[in-house]
Amino acid sequence: MKRTYQPSKRKRRNSVGFRTRMATRNGRKLLNRRRRHGRHSLVDL
């Protein structure tokens, strides 16, 4: 049986990448939250 997590850089970029976050209002809200919180990294890649 195949494992559930089959990592792919392209899929990851397209779902949690910076430009994807910037494309929607909620994504921008998320980035601003992380900025306010002082995160070292805004997106997990």
Curated annotation (Swiss-Prot):
Tell me the segments the record calls region Disordered. Answer: 1-45
Q: Which InterPro entries does its entry note?
A: Ribosomal_bL34, Ribosomal_bL34_CS
Please list the residue ranges that the record marks as compositionally biased, kind Basic residues: 1-14, 26-45
Reply yes or no: does the keyword Ribonucleoprotein apply: yes
Any Pfam family the entry gives: Ribosomal_L34
What GO annotations for molecular function exist for this entry?
A: structural constituent of ribosome
Its Gene Ontology cellular component terms are: ribonucleoprotein complex; ribosome
Q: Identify the keywords attached in UniProt to this record, alphabetized.
A: Ribonucleoprotein, Ribosomal protein
PROSITE patterns, per the entry: RIBOSOMAL_L34
Q: Output the GO biological process annotations, alphabetical, semicolon-separated.
A: translation
- Give the highest taxon in the source lineage: Bacteria
The answer to whether UniProt assigns keyword Ribosomal protein to this entry is: yes
Q: Which family does it belong to?
A: Belongs to the bacterial ribosomal protein bL34 family.
Name of the protein this chain belongs to: Large ribosomal subunit protein bL34
This chain's source organism reads: Chlamydia pneumoniae (Chlamydophila pneumoniae)
